[in-house]
Amino acid sequence: QLVCKLKGIPSYGIDANNFMVFAAQQKLNWNVNCDAIEAAKQHIIATYLAAAAGIDWDDRDHLAALANTDRPAALDCRYISDKPLVKIKLLKAAVEAQTEGAERDLFLFAISSILVPVSNVKYGPGFGIGKPKEDADVLQAFRDKVNMMLTDLRSVTDVQRRTLATTLLGDSRSLTDYVAENSISLMITSPPYPGDHEYTKHSKLELIFQGYATDLASFRTIKKRMIRGSTTNIYKEDHERALVEDIAEIRQITDLIDARLKSDGATSGFEKLYTKLIWEYFGGMAATLRECYRVLRPGGKISLLVSDSHAFKMVHIQTAELLRIVGERLGYVNAEVVLWQMKNSTSHKYQLRENILILEK
């Protein structure tokens, strides 16, 4: 959507993750008074410094008490050390005291974007916890981020500023709830693929900070809007496999995984979900592609960037090829699978294809 807006092309976006929608809305809001943002930034910094001056930053017990005040259940104490967390909380309070509306959202987004750098969280590519950072220059990180945002906002043209870019929170499997049928010329997406990645973890701190997900139940609500791509995102009521159960190529994959599980004597709860995950993934993608077909204009195209996978008992899953079969069954024509790049597996010493699948209505 950002590229579309830069090119003057109207766009819509749908995402299941509350924070990703919030982030997109901030990045696409270019009707901003930069002078007012600069002035508000100075007021926020002054308010922050006044509050920080009243804290004994060497009193570890006092810092711990401040850090734990109103701590969300989902914010594990290992994720961010007490001192940086207290600074983040002071900065958020300063933003809330000095701003409102769209201006406030912009500054809260700036804080969200510095959470990972000042925290102990790391990605490799999965969610992990690194060496604790006892302190971090939160204020400088915030100042630098806002200054960068202002530089970008001052560079846009009036045409770019006026170009429509709408991002909605929703489930792509119900796309016609948000987008009119036969209204879209081109769709571009990089959906989940069956690699056992739990996608809410990639924005866990941000979801907690913004209050979108503060406990297991609220995270589960978000995950249920997502395509099933992880064994931690499978539910009893899932039933979309019915859309693809008669596709022999998918059954070959699940049969091979099942055979290897039995051969290895696999008994863990997650391993028992492997084949269900594959069925629900391709079923969910079938539901999504069906909806995409409805909103595309005749001759319109959808482009999907997906990776192959070896995540389940080393069985090779050719994601783009299988989705091509699914798409053609739904009525798409002129399918193409184009190699985007070869990428290194993060858990094994080999390369995987990352392909672009192009389908036409």
Regions found by a protein language model. Give the residues of each.
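Class I S-adenosyl-L-methionine-dependent methyltransferase module
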Residues: 6, 10-158, 200-271
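A short acidic, Gly/Pro-enriched loop at the edge of an enzyme's catalytic core
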Residues: 176-188, 196
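Core SAM-dependent methyltransferase catalytic element
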Residues: 297, 349-361
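Conserved S-adenosyl-L-methionine
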Residues: 332-342
